[in-house]
Regions:
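Short phosphate-binding/catalytic loops that engage adenosine nucleotides
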Residues: 10, 86, 106
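Substrate-recognition "cap/lid" segment bordering the active-site pocket of phosphatases
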Residues: 13, 19-70, 75-84, 98-102
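Short acidic-hydrophobic, aromatic-tinged amphipathic segments that line or gate anion-handling sites
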Residues: 108-112
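The conserved SAM/SAH-binding core of class I Rossmann-like methyltransferase domains
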Residues: 71, 89-91
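Short amphipathic alpha-helix with an adjacent loop that forms part of the alpha/beta core around
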Residues: 118-124
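Short beta->alpha connector loops at strand-helix junctions that form conserved
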Residues: 43, 92-93
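Flexible glycine-rich beta->alpha loop in the catalytic core of nucleotide-sugar glycosyltransferases
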Residues: 87, 94-96
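Catalytic-core regions built around general acid/base machinery
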Residues: 1-9
Length: 124
């Protein structure tokens, strides 16, 4: 999915609560480090739900926040999107219960990766 979105011209970024060392280790272990156009970590800027991570990534990539989508499995992710003026997509297969995610008013909630993939291809 990530490779396809990248090939279609979408910018891919990571905004994480992990440290830079932790993120690079995780992305290297999965062979995904070069897949992302930009990344931002909690030890580099304000933590979620503060909008700074998303604002910095959007600015770095030269994008408009109104065309930015934050995909997240926590309320912190979705609140960061709300605080930054971006759209949020919730994924049910993560850390927080779907009821808590829905309270953040995401534009879409995906039950699984194939459903997320389909929605992104059709709507993003």
């Amino acid at each position: 999915m990530l490779e396809e979105l990248s090939q279609l011209g979408y910018f891919l970024a990571v905004a994480t609560g992990k440290s830079r060392v932790g993120l690079n280790r995780a992305l290297n272990a999965c062979g995904l480090l070069s897949t992302f156009d930009a990344t931002r970590c909690a030890d580099e800027t304000f933590s979620k739900p503060h909008p700074a991570m998303l604002q910095e990534l959007t600015r770095e990539l030269g994008q408009d926040m109104r065309r930015t989508v934050m995909i997240g499995d926590t309320t912190h992710d979705l609140l960061m999107a709300n605080n930054a003026g971006a759209s949020g997509i919730a994924v049910e297969y993560g850390a927080h219960p779907v009821q808590q995610l829905q309270a953040c008013h995401p534009i879409f909630t995906a039950k699984n990766v194939p459903e997320l993939h389909q929605w992104l291809i059709e709507n993003a």
